[in-house]
């Protein structure tokens, strides 16, 4: 790994993101595509930008990201978590500010499994009294 490059792994739901940051002009590449092309949804892009906007570092780093699994929302959350970890690897003094915003904590919520005899995880079949 390059001397001035920092790495962070982020996870959310069933998505996992590998984030590499290095000093640059603010280019973000996700799976060999620009962020705007990869995420059509504005909300997903906003989630990705959150840690950088918080620290006013929007144009200080170039980000190279690979992300696998899950959907749009999970991938965006995984990337945010990865960026946060990479920024902490770059400068540990950023941790309290990122922690206060809630970006350091891994969101542990996962999909609940479907149970036998139920239609979904908790949805029971309709009850008929007679």
From Swiss-Prot:
<dbReference type="InterPro" id="IPR020574">
    <property type="entry name" value="Ribosomal_uS9_CS"/>
</dbReference>
<dbReference type="InterPro" id="IPR014721">
    <property type="entry name" value="Ribsml_uS5_D2-typ_fold_subgr"/>
</dbReference>
<keyword id="KW-0689">Ribosomal protein</keyword>
<dbReference type="GO" id="GO:0003735">
    <property type="term" value="F:structural constituent of ribosome"/>
</dbReference>
<dbReference type="InterPro" id="IPR000754">
    <property type="entry name" value="Ribosomal_uS9"/>
</dbReference>
<dbReference type="GO" id="GO:0003723">
    <property type="term" value="F:RNA binding"/>
</dbReference>
<protein>
    <recommendedName>
        <fullName>Small ribosomal subunit protein uS9</fullName>
    </recommendedName>
</protein>
<dbReference type="GO" id="GO:0022627">
    <property type="term" value="C:cytosolic small ribosomal subunit"/>
</dbReference>
<dbReference type="GO" id="GO:0006412">
    <property type="term" value="P:translation"/>
</dbReference>
<dbReference type="InterPro" id="IPR023035">
    <property type="entry name" value="Ribosomal_uS9_bac/plastid"/>
</dbReference>
<comment type="similarity">
    <text>Belongs to the universal ribosomal protein uS9 family.</text>
</comment>
<dbReference type="InterPro" id="IPR020568">
    <property type="entry name" value="Ribosomal_Su5_D2-typ_SF"/>
</dbReference>
<dbReference type="Pfam" id="PF00380">
    <property type="entry name" value="Ribosomal_S9"/>
</dbReference>
<keyword id="KW-0687">Ribonucleoprotein</keyword>
